[in-house]
A protein has these predicted regions:
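Class I S-adenosyl-L-methionine
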Residues: 1-180
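C-terminal target-recognition/interaction regions appended to catalytic cores
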Residues: 107-267
Length: 267
């Protein structure tokens, strides 16, 4: 878990800062929330800068992530120490706790953890899904046949129904509805590994275009992760596989911007 990861890096001589970043909060085309870890070896230039700052100042003013993606404090600061071996932490850390001790923003240095909630600060414009859609003719394979529309609607819709498990157990299944078709005036939902498949799905995107209702193309999925066009187009790589690859990827715009800041910090 999170504590084991931090302690492992601490044992290897790293200080760590982290932030949960939703790419769409900073003007990117996909709502994809991921934890970004930055580790600084004790002999590195950034580590020495970190040591001169306080943990709270690093997280809210001086740090690499804060100088890439601005955020403001949204909770009290929590501090604690990781000082046990990995086995003990794995077996006993926060046992019985009802919530994680780690917030969406934090750092660890010499086993001392500082963590707090933050919220994103961004004054630019969002990037809507419609801005990355292909302009030309899209292959017929991506359009949803009318015969499959009822199944798409069922899967995307709200449900409260009895189901029977493989061993005969009857249980109540319920879930809320999803927007269908997807709203192209907002950043996309998180794309997943099954995005490239053809069958009706609750989680695949479906957009209404002037030519009909269709799924997203591999090119559009690449753009949602901010890869170059046709980055995954190779002989023998199917469209389904290309969708799978993008479902496993990060929004590289986040990584690129953090990398640019790291470069500046190391000059």
């Amino acid at each position: 878990d999170f504590a084991v990861m931090l302690q492992s890096l601490n044992d290897l001589g790293y200080a760590v800062e982290w932030r949960v970043i939703n790419a769409a909060d900073y003007g990117m085309p996909q709502r994809r929330r991921r934890v970004f870890f930055l580790g600084y070896k004790k002999d590195s230039k950034v580590y020495k800068q970190l040591k001169k700052s306080t943990p709270v100042d690093w997280l809210l003013k001086d740090g690499v992530i804060q100088n890439t993606f601005k955020a403001e404090q949204d909770s009290e600061v929590s501090e604690f120490v990781l000082d046990n071996d990995l086995v003990d932490i794995s077996n006993n850390f926060n046992v019985g706790g009802k919530k994680s001790l780690f917030e969406n923003t934090g750092m660890m240095i010499d086993g001392e953890v500082t963590t707090l909630k933050t919220f994103p600060v961004y004054k630019g414009k969002p990037t809507p899904l419609k801005s990355i859609l292909e302009k030309g003719k899209v292959d017929e394979e991506f359009f949803i046949p009318k015969s499959e529309l009822p199944q798409w609607k069922y899967l995307k819709g709200a449900k409260s129904e009895e189901r029977v498990s493989a061993d005969g157990y009857v249980y109540k299944y319920a879930e809320g509805s999803m927007v269908f078709p997807d709203d192209v005036d907002q950043p996309s939902r998180t794309i997943i590994t099954s995005e490239g498949g053809k069958s009706p799905s609750r989680f695949r995107h479906a957009i209404q275009t002037k030519d009909g209702l269709r799924r997203l193309t591999p090119l559009e999925l690449e753009r949602l992760n901010m890869f170059p066009d046709n980055h995954t187009e190779f002989e023998g790589v199917t469209n389904s596989k290309r969708g799978f690859l993008m479902g496993n990827a990060l929004v590289v715009g986040v990584v690129e911007k953090i990398g640019e800041t790291l470069y500046r910090f190391n000059q």
